[in-house]
């Protein structure tokens, strides 16, 4: 019975998100589950993912489940600290507190041991905090 209601709940959330996105003429940002499906569909084997903008770590968590390593860059100190706590037991996640334009070159130079490299540019101005990325 619980699974039935969970499924109904998520269908409602997805439908509502898609309707809102449609009303905005499919302008950015797309619903989170749409982004996640695109990421899963385009993932490469044995990949290193670099994510700019950790925020609350939902995409970071997804990436850690489908890749060999995730490096997530978060400029906001509060969100960085939250991510460190959230992922303290994750062996394949590295969180960096910096702006992506200040650290991306260094990350690319120091990570050549992965077969594939994928970059998810997700740093942007969020509604509830201000970080100029």
Where are these regions (language model features)?
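A short alpha-helical cap/connector motif
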Residues: 1-119, 124-133
């Amino acid at each position: 019975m619980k699974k039935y209601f969970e499924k109904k709940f998520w269908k409602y959330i997805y439908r509502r998100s898609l309707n809102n996105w449609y009303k905005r003429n499919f302008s950015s940002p797309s619903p989170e589950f749409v982004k996640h499906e695109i990421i899963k569909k385009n993932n490469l084997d044995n990949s290193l993912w670099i994510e700019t903008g950790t925020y609350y770590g939902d995409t970071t968590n997804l990436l850690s489940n489908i890749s060999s390593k995730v490096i997530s860059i978060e400029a906001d100190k509060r969100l960085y600290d939250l991510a460190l706590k959230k992922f303290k037991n994750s062996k394949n996640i590295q969180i960096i507190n910096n702006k992506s334009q200040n650290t991306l070159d260094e990350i690319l130079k120091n990570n050549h041991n992965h077969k594939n490299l994928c970059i998810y540019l997700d740093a942007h101005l969020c509604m509830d905090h201000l970080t100029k990325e």
